[in-house]
């Protein structure tokens, strides 16, 4: 036999045989070959190696230490002490309400707090102010004043501070006509804070930070009067404050504080009533600091850390007050105020004063 390939329309390949006599060929049907049964090999699962267990994992703490937060509280405390002392333009306000010109004094006290960026402070303070004012021929009422504030601070981990702030200033009140007015005031002074910062285990660092401060502000208002003595008075205020920088030591740590400038604005609404020789009023205000960042560097040995304290924010307040004139030359005034919201929040503050005209 022999092997041949036959190709036709349907192709088939295999063996053929033929006969020698007549040359006839026959196709030899191949024997079927069985298909082997698949025998897959089982897959052995791979067990991942266990991760090693760290019996003492490292837990990262805050970037700034409790000592740094205590020092930062003292620095911000100075700024808020100046804000409490110099930013209310109080004397121009009572002159606008009808207080006579002359020699005057005001004493009061209260609380305020500040929380933000890891610090939490509470301050009790006493404030004394006094001055003299008079009317001019140009339609302005002008005066000068001195102010003093003393406060006790509480910081995190029983840290503490003793604040002192002193300022001298000038102010003016101008009637613009049509029941409109403008108040101007400028103050310059110095603030200091003798502080002790503590950590979780009571270790303390003590020091004193001081800075010169400057403020100038303006207020515009319009009085809408009614026949029964009631009035409504919308107000708008804008002020600019600058603090000089300071460099001081707190124990083994050296601190370098940059100067800071801040611009703040406020809107208020006063509702009151005049009667005979006096008046009473209620006032609500919303204030916003548009700028201000305190940059501080803390150096211990060869290590220096830096913090930024943002002073921008909004706070609201509420006040009640009044005045009464005994005669043309002697008058008393008082007010009660509190903060409603904000990082800087005043607690209840009580103030009283008198004016004597020569």
Give short role names for the model-derived ranges.
Residues 5-11, 16-17, 137, 327-330, ...:
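Long, low-complexity, Gly/Thr
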Residues 1-73:
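Extracellular/surface-exposed low-complexity segments
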Residues 55-232, 337, 342, 347-349:
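Outer membrane beta-barrel translocator domains of Type V secretion systems
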Residues 67, 117-123, 156-158, 192-210, ...:
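Solvent-exposed, glycine/polar-rich loop segments of beta-barrel outer-membrane systems
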Residues 232, 237-243:
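Solvent-exposed flexible segments
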Residues 1, 238-240, 267-268, 321:
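Predominantly extracellular/luminal carbohydrate-interaction, adhesion, and secreted-enzyme modules
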Residues 169, 226, 255-358:
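Outer membrane beta-barrel transmembrane domains
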Residues 96-97, 134-138, 174-178, 224-228, ...:
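Outer-membrane beta-barrel strand-turn architecture
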């Amino acid at each position: 036999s022999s092997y041949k390939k036959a190709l036709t329309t349907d192709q088939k390949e295999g063996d053929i045989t033929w006969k020698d006599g007549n040359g006839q060929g026959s196709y030899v049907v191949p024997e079927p070959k069985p298909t082997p049964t698949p025998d897959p090999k089982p897959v052995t699962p791979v067990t991942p190696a266990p991760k090693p267990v760290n019996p003492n994992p490292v837990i990262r703490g805050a970037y700034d230490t409790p000592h740094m937060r205590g020092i930062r509280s003292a620095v911000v405390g100075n700024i808020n002490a100046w804000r409490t002392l110099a930013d209310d333009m109080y004397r121009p306000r009572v002159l606008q309400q009808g207080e006579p010109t002359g020699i005057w004094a005001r004493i009061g006290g209260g609380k305020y707090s500040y929380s933000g960026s890891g610090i939490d402070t509470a301050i009790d303070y006493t404030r004394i102010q006094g001055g003299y004012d008079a009317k001019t021929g140009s339609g302005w009422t002008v005066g000068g004043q001195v102010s003093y504030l003393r406060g006790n601070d509480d910081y995190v981990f029983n840290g503490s501070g003793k604040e002192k702030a002193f300022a001298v200033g000038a102010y003016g009140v101008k009637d613009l006509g049509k029941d409109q007015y403008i108040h101007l005031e400028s103050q310059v002074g110095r603030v200091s804070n003798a502080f002790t910062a503590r950590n979780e285990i009571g270790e303390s660092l003590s020091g004193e930070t001081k800075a010169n401060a400057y403020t100038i502000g303006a207020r515009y208002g319009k009085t809408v009067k009614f026949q029964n003595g009631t009035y409504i008075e919308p107000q708008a205020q804008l002020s600019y404050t600058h603090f000089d920088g300071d460099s001081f030591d707190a124990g083994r740590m050296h601190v370098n504080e940059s100067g800071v400038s801040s611009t703040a604005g406020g809107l208020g609404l006063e509702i009151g009533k005049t009667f005979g020789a006096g008046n009473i009023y209620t006032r609500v205000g919303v204030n916003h600091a548009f700028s201000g960042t305190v940059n501080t560097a803390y150096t211990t040995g060869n290590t220096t850390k830096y913090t930024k304290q943002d002073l921008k924010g909004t706070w609201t307040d509420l006040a009640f007050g009044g005045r009464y004139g005994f005669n043309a030359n002697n008058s008393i005034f008082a007010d009660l105020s509190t903060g409603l919201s904000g990082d800087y929040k005043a607690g209840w503050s009580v103030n009283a004063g008198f004016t004597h005209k020569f």
